[in-house]
Every structure is written in C-alpha cells, then in structure tokens.
Amino acid sequence: MRFTLSWLLEHLETNASLEEITDKLTHIGLEVKDVVDNTKLAGFIVAKVLEVTPHPNVDKLKLCKVDNGSKILQIVCGANNVREGLKTVLASLGSTLPESNFTIKPTKIRGVLSEGILCSASELMLAQEKSKGIIELSDDYKVGNKFFNCDPVIDINVTTNRGDCLSVHGIARDLAATGIGTLNSLIYSSAIPAHDTGIQDRSKSGMTRSSSINVKVIDGESFISGVYISNVRNKESPRWLKDRLESVGMRSISAIVDITNYIMMSFGRPMHAYDAKKIEGKLIVRKANNGEKFTGLNGKEYLLNNDISVISDNNNIHAIAGIIGGKCSKCTLETTDVFLESAWFNPISVTKSSRQLNISTDSSYRFARSVDPGFILDGLHFAAQMIVDLCGGKASNVVFAGSLDEADTKVSFDYQDVNKFGSVSVLPDEMFDILTKLGFSTDKKTENNWNVKVPSWRSDVTIPADLVEEVVRIYGYDKIKEEPLIDNVEVEINTHDNLRVLMISRGFHEVFTWSFMSESIAEKFGYSNKLFIIDNPFNNNFNIMRPSIVPNLLQVTADNIVHGMSDLAIFEIGPVYDSLDQPKYSLSGIRTGNNLPRNHYNTDRKIDVFDAKADLIAALELFNVSYGNLTIERAEKEYYHPGKSGTLSFKNKATGYFGELHPNILDLFDIKQKVVGFEMILENMGNLPVSREKFIDYKHQSVKRDFAFIVNRDVEVGKIINMVKKSSELITEVFVFDVYHGNNMEPNKMSIALSVTFCSPTHTLIEEEIQKESSAIVNLVHKNTGGILRYT
C-alpha cells in the first residue's frame, strides 16, 4: 500500500515528522517497506520562456529570459523548440540532473552567463531515447510550481487480515489511536438528492426514482448500489489529482476514472464507473454461463464459467464482479452520462474468480480482503460529489439491490485479559481510549466485563483475543515486559529438522511424495489388513493412505533411473498409516548405484546393505541410542531380501528396518539394479531428547582385533554382533568389515569378519587381558552358532 505524506496529512492532524510516522507504523504492525523521499528533485521548477534572442557569439545558441515564478533568469539554450510563451522545466542552480549526475552552477557559455538549464525529457530520465528538444508542458502547469512531486512516498506491507489499512484513512485511524495525531472527520456535501441519504429498505430490489438504469442481483451473494449522473463533461484530471495518483504508481485515465481510483486509495472503497449510454436495460449481478466471453478494460478476452459472478445488461457483460470492468462500457472523454457503482461482493468468490482468470487488480485485491460494507453509500456520495464538482452534471437518487448482512458483531471482553496475556500494564481507561479511537464502541457491562461492538471495517475481529491484540498492538509491543527464562528449561529441538540435516550431510536429497498409493501395490508389499481406504480417490493409483514411504521412494527411484540418474540417494520424512490409529511419522531412505560420484581421488563402489544399515544407525544415534545398545534381528518386512536385511531394536521395541529390496519388489517398478533402503518410525523412539550422546574421553589406549568366523549361511550376522557386544564390558565397538562365500569354502558356509575394539576406562590393557577376551569371543561364537575361527 503506497501513499504520500501529504495525502496522509489530509486524514491525520499531526506535527510528527516523517521518521516518527514511519517508526510508529512499523511498531503497530504496518511494516514500512520503503520510503521514497524526492526532496532532492525540488530544484526542478515549472518555468515560462518570456523572450528568445540569438546568442551574440554562437549561431546555434539562444539567450532566453525565463520566469521561474519568483524572478526573471537568463538561460542559454540550444534546443530547436525553445520559443516565447513555452512552459518547460527549469533545472535551478544547485539541482542535479538525474541522467548525468551533473550539478547546475552559474556558468558562462561563450562569454554569456547562464543561470540554469532548460531540461529535455532524457536529461530527467523521463524518456529512454535522447530527446531532440526541451520538455513542452501544457497550460495547466503553474509557473513556479515544482515539476516533480517532492512529497515523500511511503510503502507499507499490509497483512491479509487488515483490508481496512488498504486505504489512507484506515492507516490514519491506526496512527491516531497511538496518540501521534488526531483523525480528521469525514465531512462531505453530496450531489445526490438530500432525501436519499441512506438505504432504508433493501427488500425492494431495484428501487429507483430518477435514474434510467435499474439494478438486480440474482447471484445470491452480492449487494450493489449506484447513482446515475447525467450531462457530465469528462476530461483530463486536474494536475493535483494526476500527481496524487501517479505518485503511488497509478496511471491517470480521465477525471471520472481517476476519481474512482482516488476514492479507492483514500477510503478503501473500490468503485466502477460505466458509460451509462452503453448499458441496455437493467444491470444484473449474476453467475456467468459456461463458455461466455468477456473483454476487459485491459483489452484481453476471458472465457468464463458458472462459478464467476458478472455484471451484465440484456446483451453484454459489463464487468467481472469486484475484479475488472468491461471494454464495452468504459468511460472515455466522450462520455456524457455515467452510472457510478458502489458494491459489496463475496471475498471468497472474488478470490476464486481472480485466480481462475489470472487477473489481479487493485479492486480485486481489496474485495478479496473484505471491504467495509458500511462505507458503500458514503463512497457513492464522495465520488458523485467529486464528479459533479469536476465534470458537472446532475446526480439521480440511489438505486440498490441484493442482500447485505449488516448485523453488528459484539464481543464480550474481560479487560484484565490484556495485562494477563499481553504481559503489559495498561490502565482500563487507556484500553477504553485505544478501542474507541480504533472505532470500537465499548459498553461497560460490569466492572471487568465489557461489551464491545466491532466496527464494520474490522471483519477480522471476532473473539476476545483479537481485542487483546488490538490493545497491545497500539499500546506498543516494545512495552511488553521481559520475563526471565526459568532455569533448567529443556529446549525442544525439532526432530524432523535434525534428521533432515543429518541425511543431507550423508549425501541424501530430500523428496516429497504423495501420502496416497495404490492398494494393489500395498498388498504386494505385504500390507493387506487395516488399510486406510479413500472413499473418493482422484484415481485408482492413489486409493489408500500409504502404510510405508518405501513404495513411493521406489517409484521416484524408477523415474530417475529412466532419465539416466542411476546413482541416487533420497529420503523423506512424512506420515504413514499402517494401522487404523493415528498416523505415525516415518523416516525412510533409498540408495542405489555407486556410493560416490566419479572422481580421480577415490574409487567408487556399488552400494550394499551395510550402507543402509549405517544410515539407520546414524539416525538412531540422534536419539541418544548408541550402536552398542541396539540388537539386530532378521527383518520383519517381506519386501526386503531375507538374507540381506535386518531389524534394529532398542529396549525390545523395533525402531527401524534396513536391507536390500527384494528382487520381486524391484520388478514391480522395472528396476534392474540393486537398491537398498531403511525406515524408522519416529514415535517408537518415545520421549527421548533429540541430542548427541555425550562424548566419553577414554584416557587409555584402545586395541583392535579382527576375527573371521566360518559359519553356516543361515546364521544371522546380527546375532553374532549382539552376542559379541554383550560378552564383555571392555568391548566398545563391534562391526562387520567383510562377508565372503565362494571358492575354497563349502556351499553352505560363509566367512564373517568382525573388527572388535577393546578399551578399559581405568587402565591400559595388557596382552594377557586382550588374549583372554579374544578367547572368550571365539568360544562364545562357537558355542552359539557352531562357527569356527578362520583367522585373527
């Protein structure tokens, strides 16, 4: 929302400086985005050439006597179009040309003093190409006035709930409530007949007296009013109105159109002016027919449907309600009769129509945020009077149609809530004053309980908490008391964000997939019971809520492989629905292809099941679960390879699964290469804090020993790891670094190579202790699995 300082001061009586005003705006929640202060352009003046004579020393130059409104100056000029009586732009001494950054000084040109420069459009950066002559101004420019509008322009961000602040008057009201100034009252005379100052009977749709245009509403959700102004003389807007609109980025069209834009910017009341002679019969607010076409004021043609409200007569559509007027009835300089519309349209309908048609206008922006229904008639009076004042003509009575819910919104409010929930110290009289200045009517029902009537322009205020916010906002967020933090407060860390950081650090890319999947695919993954069936799926491939993220990740993997991305690591955190209870959040990841991108430093290798296991363990460690406290068992999920997968459990509860995906599952997605994956249910981790395990500094040297056992191929590797871990308190780490089966080994046998780390927290281990622990490991594995030591 852009406005000038002088525009604001028409609505706000204040002695505050520009800086004080902008600071206060930000403090009350109307964030100042930008302030453009054009005072550096104050030296460019509207001037008039009084006399032109040849330069005594140069044929191509001329001596000009120029009136700048206060004195006559001598200017040397070489422009071909300089002549007596011409109004142009004078760059006064001390001003700086925008194009060249040249500062104007008294200069002798071929022996003759020049006291300024007569400017071309390109020198003022008003034209892209170099101008051939100096600027020629129309007669409505007054000599001595500043050429540029040097009024500071303030640009603020307005949140979607504050449609009332999409107007200069609404902004002034908020500022006045802070005590920085006083809101000026809305006083106007009206060109509309005096007996028609209100809308008393809206049940009489289309009431009219002297207008030749009637109105009707049949879309069931709109209200429209209007006035017919005859015998107008439309023309260019006066300079003050042009300057005001152009300063906030609006293009001047004509006096009638500019007046409607001026009312919109001043009071937040969108309006539309029709060339009344182009309207045949009634103006009707209705739903468009499918396939109807409409050409807007912007010259574009739009294909409409029956969700879009339009305003039409017997033959043509003249506007899309609340969004844009039609080309067929636009006001031009030849317009003599005007129908001026002031209406209320449903914000949701305007928003939907605007999105469907991809049209965004100043009008739709305001209607979508709910304009003030209480200002419909006032806006009509303001605009009609301005049109009659500037363009002449005679206004009819008001016509209106449709329904408008003007029921008063009242909120029961305990003023003690302000200090209780806002952590401020505001006196009741101060609260009462703030609410009154914001337009709320407050009746004190009891000492503590107030009955507050909400003004028509504040549709966002509906509950007591809204009133608490209003008081605290105006009183000052900077006055909220500081509260010391309580000692030993546990900081809640976002689990999902921590896991995302971890996965990305391990080379994964995050993806987001649908929460739906195909029931037939789910059944092939072993999910057949307790599925969440969707009653109205948008297609049969998405007819259940997903019981696992893995199938969706496999589909993403397949799509990437088809497009040449055979090396892939992706993960997702999202809800899964594996029972009829509430959804649970899962972390799932997939790897395929090589473990590293090709490079000349390292040799890549194909990913394997141990990569997936390492990913899962890294995720579990975020929950303070060390690898030593985990048990590994055969995978419970049917879609993993039975001999190359596992379940990691913590405190007898399954926390995650990992493994190579079953070949039959990969065939479903037409994947021809090895894929490994993992998944964990975050709720299964309980209420453990999400933090790294405290580092233990072992002061004594650790010792590593490698063991290779020959065991039957049906022995679970996880079982061996678990028993070795638990065999001694001196063992700090156990991991598999090699699995072999093939030549020189019986078909039903395999070799499992373990690396075991020993360390004592109290002393450095001696060889006898290490040998004792090693023998215990060999005996333990042989006793429980029949495995024999191959080498150490």
Curated annotation (Swiss-Prot):
Tell me the CDD domains matching this sequence: PheRS_beta_core, tRNA_bind_bactPheRS
Tell me the compartments it is located in: Cytoplasm
| Gene Ontology biological process terms from the UniProt entry | phenylalanyl-tRNA aminoacylation
Q: Report whether Aminoacyl-tRNA synthetase shows up as a keyword of the record.
A: yes
| Ligand binding (Mg(2+)) | D460, D466, E469, E470
SUPFAM superfamilies (UniProt xref): Anticodon-binding domain of PheRS, Class II aaRS and biotin synthetases, Nucleic acid-binding proteins, PheT/TilS domain, Putative DNA-binding domain
Query: A single Pfam family, by name?
Result: tRNA_synthFbeta
Task: Give the FDX-ACB domain ranges.
Answer: 698-790
Instruction: Enumerate the UniProt keywords alphabetically.
Output: Aminoacyl-tRNA synthetase, ATP-binding, Cytoplasm, Ligase, Magnesium, Metal-binding, Nucleotide-binding, Protein biosynthesis, RNA-binding, tRNA-binding
Any idea which GO molecular function terms this record carries? ATP binding; magnesium ion binding; phenylalanine-tRNA ligase activity; tRNA binding
Q: Where is the B5 domain?
A: 406-482
Q: Where is the tRNA-binding domain?
A: 38-148
Q: Which GO terms describe its cellular component?
A: phenylalanine-tRNA ligase complex
- What sort of enzyme, by top EC class, is this? ligase
Q: Does the keyword Cell cycle apply?
A: no
User: What does this protein's record comment on cofactor binding?
Assistant: Binds 2 magnesium ions per tetramer.
Instruction: Kindly state which reaction or reactions the protein catalyses.
Output: tRNA(Phe) + L-phenylalanine + ATP = L-phenylalanyl-tRNA(Phe) + AMP + diphosphate + H(+)
Question: Which InterPro entries does the record associate with it?
Answer: aa-tRNA-synth_II/BPL/LPL (IPR045864), B3/B4_tRNA-bd (IPR005146), DNA-bd_dom_put_sf (IPR009061), Fdx_antiC-bd (IPR005121), Fdx_antiC-bd_sf (IPR036690), NA-bd_OB-fold (IPR012340), Phe-tRNA-ligase_IIc_bsu (IPR045060), Phe-tRNA-ligase_IIc_bsu_bact (IPR004532)
- According to its UniProt record, which cofactors does this protein need? Mg(2+)
Q: Which NCBIfam families match?
A: pheT_bact, YtpR
Database matches in PANTHER family? PHENYLALANINE--TRNA LIGASE BETA SUBUNIT (PTHR10947:SF0), PHENYLALANYL-TRNA SYNTHETASE BETA CHAIN AND LEUCINE-RICH REPEAT-CONTAINING PROTEIN 47 (PTHR10947)
Subunit composition and interactions:
Tetramer of two alpha and two beta subunits.
Q: What is this protein called?
A: Phenylalanine--tRNA ligase beta subunit
Gene coding for it = pheT
